[in-house]
Every structure is written in structure tokens, then in C-alpha cells.
């Protein structure tokens, strides 16, 4: 499906990150996600990254093009197929996220938008995208990635030990949080919510 936009098209019913609950910033529960697109050469093809803020556990989806319908459908697919608990999603203001209201209604979640040019407000995504670029460098053609290749990279990064978790992997932290009813506080007490690099 081809999608077109006028350059001045607004994203309707946008909810600012300023209204996001404080608990999201605390990273004390699973289910608060950041979403972004890592673009391929000439903006043809993209990888959607869907990152749990508290644990760093991330799911990847391949988009041959970055239209809003394709983006919304991929997010819905990741949520449904992985049976995710979702409280909030935060993204930038790209037109590809203009179907946010449909996601909010379908999954009973709150969707927030960061301020323009404030990439640090989505720090989990930004840090993860830098790791992803080790496998898919800037300028790479992302139109024809296989599901097997994407899953291989997803598993590698989810199983890579991270400093912020005392060198546990995002997958380990995520699975422990599920056993702890979604609560991540017990895992992060020794970190005192310090903003350490991935």
C-alpha cells in the first residue's frame, strides 16, 4: 500500500511526553516502551525497534517502507505475537507514528510524543539503535532483510550483558521482572536508577 502525506500534515491528538506518568521515568515496571525506526539507504527500508524502558528488552520488525499504516501494523503485530503487557509507548514526531490513536484504542495504552529534536527523551531507543548499527551500518540497504537475520540480531542484543543491570542481559532482567509481576525495582535497587549507558 502506497502512503502519501502533505508536508504540513499534523499528527492529530498528540499527547506530550510532559503528561507521561512519573513511574515511566522511574523504569520500575515492564510495559513502558519506546519505538523508533532505523532507516536504510535513501530511506528505503527500515527496522522498527520496540524497546522496554525498564529492562532494555527489545523487539525488532522489518518495514520495506516507513508509512504510518505499515508502522502501526508492525507495532500491533509485535504486541500481539509476543503477548506483551503495554502501559505506554513513546515515540518521536515522525509522520510514520500518526496512527498512534488506533494503537491506543486497540491495546488500551497511553501514547506519548517526545519534544521535537529532544532525542535524549527517548534514551533507551537511542542507545539501542547505536548497538543495532553494529550489525546494520548507516547506508546499508534494509529493504530485503530476512526474518531469520533480524531474529538473530535481536537475540544477540537481548542476550548481551549490560552494565546498568550489573552485567545481566536484558532478556534475563525481563524474564525476572515477569516472575516478579512486572516489577523491576528489586533488580535495580543497587543501581538507584542511575542513568548508566547500555
Locate predicted features.
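Short, structured coil segments at secondary-structure junctions
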Residues: 106-107
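C-terminal domain-tail junction helix/linker
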Residues: 138-198
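Mobile genetic element proteins and their domesticated derivatives, centered on retroelements
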Residues: 36, 50, 56, 75, ...
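Active-site beta-loop-alpha junctions of metal-dependent nucleic acid enzymes
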Residues: 42-43, 60-83
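RNase H-like two-metal-ion nuclease catalytic core shared by retroviral integrases
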Residues: 91-93, 98-101, 113-134, 143-155
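Short, surface-exposed connector motifs at secondary-structure boundaries
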Residues: 55-59, 81-87, 135-136
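Mobile-element integrase/transposase regions
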Residues: 1-47
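Short conserved beta-strand segments at catalytic cores or DNA/RNA-binding microdomains
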Residues: 38, 42-59, 64
